[in-house]
Amino acid sequence: MDLSLTNRQQQVLRATVDHYIATAEPVGSKALAREYALSISPATIRNVMGRLEEEGLLFQPHTSAGRVPSDFGYRHYVDELVMPSTTLMSQIKQALDQKLRTDSWIFEVLLRDAAQILATLSGCVALITLPQAATSTIRHLHLVQVEPHRVMLILVTDAYETQSVMMELPHSAWDEVDPDRIEQELQILSNFLNHHFVGSSLQDLVALDPCELDREFQKYTDFLKILLTDLTQQCKSLSPKNILVGGLAEVLRQPEFSELQQAQTLIHLLEDGQDLLRPLFNELMADEIKQGADVVPRSTKVNVRIGSENSLESIQAYSLVSSTYQKGELPMGSVGVLGPTRMAYEKVIALVTVTADYLSTCLTQVA
């Protein structure tokens, strides 16, 4: 629905939304005239608020109360009146630089830390999806003997996730082999796997047919069959990946969750609703890629869904601000903030934007 507002109407709408975000209380014309430099009388403000209510941007929760924004009012506010400043973006970037350790090669640790920081700074729930194991590519493979007849495959993906698979050595093939020789053989096999599968997906490795190996590696056929069987089971157990959640305690302090039922609904969704949230983030990622491909600069690709705009019924009382972090041009996962529709959109949009860009930079720099 296209809507053209006058400058005065936009000023009153912005003041109303800003007041409600800050106080969680309906506001009347006298309060707006007193607290905001609108340069118009309370009577004029009251008339403008009445017009905004007719357009569906504001409503009165009670007949004797002031007005609050509707979902449509928030939508116009976000689309037309919110633009995070470069100063705010720089402050958030500086905060992430100070608080996050990017020297850790375990990317999941970085994501967990980012979720907690995002939740603390936003006062809402932070949601960050881990990269899908099935679409990750292999960065490094290493076979190491951990005890007699037991070998561990250590696998690092391009997202710096680490997986390990423990397996038993085939006794018939290795019983009489010197331990030093076993170590040499494992190194040879590690080199072979790295040469053929670095840059490939886990599925490519799982699909390897040991019977098609070069003659010099035929003696490893039984060993590789066992290894690939165990790795296949490991991959199945990893899909789908979890969603990291931070800040439940933060958002429950908001007045919207003073009622027990509201709080319980949100807690249940975040603790037990992973199967609902993952498809939602996949949908949001697809929308962002479709809308932003080759047109919008990377840092502006933020998806804001407000209240009833959310396809998932259980979050239609909330707003979700999300963006995609990626490695180069390849989307890897999503960063989101979930909170009341009365959230500080300007700050949250800046937080999500900077965090997604930050994670993308970290992934790209370690490529």
UniProtKB/Swiss-Prot annotation:
Signal peptide per UniProt: none
Family: Belongs to the HrcA family.
Protein name in UniProt: Heat-inducible transcription repressor HrcA
Record's keyword terms, sorted: Repressor, Stress response, Transcription, Transcription regulation
A UniProt-annotated Pfam family: HrcA
Source organism (scientific name): Acaryochloris marina (strain MBIC 11017)
GO biological process: negative regulation of DNA-templated transcription
MF GO annotations: DNA binding
Function of the molecule: Negative regulator of class I heat shock genes (grpE-dnaK-dnaJ and groELS operons). Prevents heat-shock induction of these operons.
